[in-house]
Amino acid sequence: MSMIDDLPPLRDVIKRHALSARKSLGQNFLLDLNLTSRIARAAGPLQDATVVEIGPGPGGLTRALLAVGAKHVIAIERDERALGALEEISDRYPGRLTIINADATDFDPRPLLGTTRAKIVANLPYNIATALLIRWLSIEPWPPWYDVMVLMFQREVAERIVARENEDAYGRLGVLSNWRAETKILFDISPAAFVPQPQVTSSVVRLIPRYNPEPCDRRSLEQVAAAAFGHRRKMLRQSLKSLPADPASLAAAAGIDPTRRAETVSISGFAAMARELASIVGSGKRL
């Protein structure tokens, strides 16, 4: 028996359903139910919550979410081999688990949610984690259909997500993440907690959507950040040359010294440059 329910231990579940982790699916199974419970609790009170989980695998986090009281869990799993294990959890928690056999990168849960706001809680497959996060942060209109995300990433990716100006990991991902959400690394998880063991430490990150982010067009923000960090060691007057505006004039119009480098510019600074760029593109003129 596990420590959170009367279902079999995860190692037994994996063996019985022949769930050897597949590298092609970015799978690393987290077997420590104390850790899965900690992740579940990090999403806040779940008693009235609908939770969307990506890549549940044998269901360790799924079980934790249900055991701590989630009203409903929507589990999106691409690997058909895991469906039997998830069905066993569904039988233990009747009416509270919906299992979707789909690829999370092109599945939209909103039709299942209706007007219900959800929480996203997941040990994301490493090979799609960043792409999924960018997708969820790029939702329009904003604010999104979720009110919190608690997600696991490789430590290096987690540091990029939460990084701010003048930090080594600051880049395009940090600009988008911190523009649209309050971000925080909650805790790390050792490779030894997984089967198979990854070669890197993992980190659990919480992202809470900002209902009123700095006003600017998202695409313009991404365009400016991509240009600026594409040549991060160069001054803005050089790195922004790929944009449809004179780079020095664009930065100056946004109140930023064009001799600065991207890594020193705050989220507000990038938003200001994005507003200037959108204005230029909209007017059909070039500064």
From Swiss-Prot:
Catalytically driven reaction(s): adenosine(1518)/adenosine(1519) in 16S rRNA + 4 S-adenosyl-L-methionine = N(6)-dimethyladenosine(1518)/N(6)-dimethyladenosine(1519) in 16S rRNA + 4 S-adenosyl-L-homocysteine + 4 H(+)
Binding residues for S-adenosyl-L-methionine: N28, L30, G55, E77, D103, N123
Enzyme class, broadest EC rank: transferase
InterPro entries, per database record: KsgA/Erm, rRNA_Ade_diMease-like_C, rRNA_Ade_Mease_Trfase_CS, rRNA_Ade_methylase_Trfase_N, rRNA_adenine_dimethylase, SAM-dependent_MTases_sf
GO cellular component: cytosol
Pfam families reported in the protein's UniProt record: RrnaAD
UniProt main location, coarse: cytoplasm
PROSITE patterns given in the database record: RRNA_A_DIMETH, SAM_RNA_A_N6_MT
EC number(s) per entry: 2.1.1.182
Cell compartments where the protein resides: Cytoplasm
Keywords assigned by UniProt, alphabetized: Cytoplasm, Methyltransferase, RNA-binding, rRNA processing, S-adenosyl-L-methionine, Transferase
Molecular function GO labels: 16S rRNA (adenine(1518)-N(6)/adenine(1519)-N(6))-dimethyltransferase activity; RNA binding
Family: Belongs to the class I-like SAM-binding methyltransferase superfamily. rRNA adenine N(6)-methyltransferase family. RsmA subfamily.
PANTHER family on file: DIMETHYLADENOSINE TRANSFERASE, DIMETHYLADENOSINE TRANSFERASE-RELATED
Function recorded in the entry: Specifically dimethylates two adjacent adenosines (A1518 and A1519) in the loop of a conserved hairpin near the 3'-end of 16S rRNA in the 30S particle. May play a critical role in biogenesis of 30S subunits.
Protein name listed in UniProt: Ribosomal RNA small subunit methyltransferase A
Chain's gene name: rsmA
